[in-house]
Amino acid sequence: MATSRRRPRSRQPELFARSKRPVIVIEENHRLVQMTDEIDWTELLELVEEIRRSKVTSAAGRPPHLRALTGALVFRATRRMPYRVTEDQIRHYAPARYLCGLTESEWTPDANTIQDFEQQLGEDGIRRLNEYVVKWAVEEKLADPKLMVADTTAQEAAIPHPNEMGLMATFVSAVVAASKRVGPALKGFLAKAGGLFVAAKRKVREYRLFAKDKSKAAKDRMTAQMATVVESVQKQLAQALRHAGAVKDRLKRHRKIAWTKIQRVHQTMAKLLPQIRYWLKTGYVAANKIISLHVPELYSIVRGKVGKTVEFGLSWGIRRLRGGFLLATLAKNKNDVHDSKFAVRAVKDHVTLFGKPPKAYAYDRGGWSRENVEQLKKLGVRDVGLAPQGKADWAVQGKVKEKLIAERALVEGGIGTIKAGKYGFNKPAAKSVDTMAMCGQRAVLGFNLNKMVRGLAERKEMVLVG
């Protein structure tokens, strides 16, 4: 039987094949072109190399393409995109190749290389790059460190809303999936605990389908029954991990990763189960409640907002200089950047970075106390604009007070901008706290770089495109 020939898509094909090596002119006023031309790459690459040397234990191997990788980091910072999209953009988007210094080369960094480079820099490394950009803005008179305002915010994690039944269902699913990937080492555990997995699946389905119409007591009873099943799984899993301990050293690649994951989930659930039992018994949430099985370092942050009283993720302190440039400080724990503490710490960090305190400083009423006002004055702040609580008086009056109130309101706009989808501060595609923190600093870096290039373009009376 003769095969039919496929009809060509074009009724009138080209006489000569079109070239796949186009020659185009990149506009001088393109945002990425101006950014590339204005950045002092010598200084920036020296800083990147210094950060890299502090983290690399051996200099063996081929040297990295720091110029291209730093350009890729800047490109990703100014507009949120996945790593593979970044690779594709750098390969085919002329302004991005110009930013990475690759217009005379056919080489392109792949997605894995870009990701490894960012993870090597880490949150602290990208924070230092951001401080470099802010100091550059101060030199260009686009930012004024003499006036600073500060606030705290929450970086929400990309996790489902935590509840006890959901966390236990996640545990069972993770244990089953990881045990299958481990292979023969946990084959006996899967066979022995098969009935428990079926029971857990049935209870989760019943809860999700029918608990909506039941009373709180009935819901708690269903949760307690599920907790009993999970406890049995935990006991059998602990025995299986002990018996298979000698085998773990022979595991390779994906099986080794699955073994590590199942151990981590097992340890997390050992802490979570008592918290669930405490909640069922008392009706109160336990201190340091685990809200994510896969990222147990996350915590709840009470915000008191309308429609969103609690957020789940990480706490950050944000400082804003006059001119709009931002500096971000990651909390080491849940209470590290509480308003009452960060109101003073922000000025201390400012002194560390610039060598002297701001002349004027503003913070909302969450940071007010007479002790904080006195401490800020001792640090050298002339105009202390902490919004007072109750009937207490302001430490400043008149136009100074009005100016500080106006500047204080602007920090909310900056925080809202970095949380927009363009920069990706909120709910980043991250599976660890370290990656979340890195994404947060990268969002602030992109915000400052875009602000920087717009300010420099305005001086030239140039309208940016791209």
Give the residues covered by each predicted segment:
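Anion-binding and metal-coordination hotspots
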Residues: 82-85, 90, 106-107, 114-466
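Charged, often Cys/His-bearing segments associated with DNA-binding zinc-finger transcription factors
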Residues: 1-44, 49-50, 454-466
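Amphipathic alpha-helical interaction surfaces
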Residues: 75-78, 92-96, 320
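Basic, short loop/linker segments at the boundary and entry of helix-turn-helix/winged-helix-like folds
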Residues: 25-74, 78, 394
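A short structural micro-motif
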Residues: 54, 93-96, 136-139
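Short, positively charged loop/turn segments that connect secondary-structure elements
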Residues: 93-113
